[in-house]
Regions:
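Short coil-to-helix segment of the ABC ATPase nucleotide-binding domain corresponding to the Q-loop/switch region
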Residues: 107, 172-183
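Short helix-to-turn junction characteristic of helix-turn-helix DNA-binding domains
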Residues: 41, 166-170, 183
Length: 227
């Protein structure tokens, strides 16, 4: 099982997450501040990071920025306070893979961890093509990469799964609830805004002008569709 580092200065939240994840079979490391987090990321093999941005000693923002600057691609789930406006663009630029708002349920966190750690988006016997052209980009679902203008970008399993679902239903709207059920694997749906967060990232990769999308189209009141 994956080794998860939980970085959270509120001991009650950190301990509860750690205990529940251990019961699920994960190896868990804990850190209560940003300096300890950076040290553990440097010295221990970590497969997944749960990171609160508001930390003592060194902010979670700095921890994440340094992690990505060093080339690490481990999945990062950010914890944010519900009463704070989530700056999705900032999270994208920092390299976050997903976020949850406090208070959250353990089931929601666990579903996101499993979705981000998924190694493949293809089921046994799936004959879908592994490489597909979308607009002016080439997506390799086997390698989780997107190539555009001679630049190659990494996709998370969630983002690759979202693209695959929209391609399967090309021209038809995919609801936020459908994304969460089929890509995230939720049975009980949380706040659907996390879908919009990932659509924002995909548009920044696929669209020539993300503010005027021509590839991933918003269907108001419903969800999104692939043009």
């Amino acid at each position: 099982m994956a080794r998860i580092l939980i970085v959270e200065d509120e001991e009650a939240i950190r301990s509860a997450l750690a205990e529940n994840l251990r019961l699920e079979g994960y190896e868990v490391e804990e850190a209560g501040d940003g300096i300890e987090a950076s040290r553990k990321l440097e010295t221990e093999p970590i497969d997944f990071l749960i990171l609160d941005l508001m930390l003592p000693e060194k902010s979670g923002t700095d921890v994440l920025k340094e992690l990505r600057e060093k080339g690490s691609k481990i999945p990062v789930l950010v914890l944010t306070a519900r009463d704070r406006e989530v700056d999705k663009v900032l999270l994208l630029e920092l390299g976050a893979d997903d976020y949850v708002t406090k208070p959250f349920s353990f089931a929601e966190v666990l579903a996101r961890i499993k979705a981000l750690l998924r190694r493949t988006i293809f089921s046994e016997g799936d004959s879908s093509p592994r490489t597909v052209n979308i607009g002016s980009a080439e997506v390799d679902f086997g390698a989780f990469t997107l190539k555009k203008n001679d630049k190659v970008y990494n996709l998370s399993p969630l983002e690759a799964g979202m693209l695959k679902l929209m391609l399967e239903k090309r021209g038809k709207a995919v609801t936020r609830e459908e994304f969460l059920r089929k890509v995230w694997g939720y049975s009980i749906l949380p706040d659907t805004r996390t879908v919009d967060f990932h659509i924002l990232k995909l548009r920044r990769l696929l669209e020539d002008d993300p503010a005027n999308p021509q590839v991933i189209i918003t269907v108001h009141g419903v969800g999104y569709r692939m043009a």
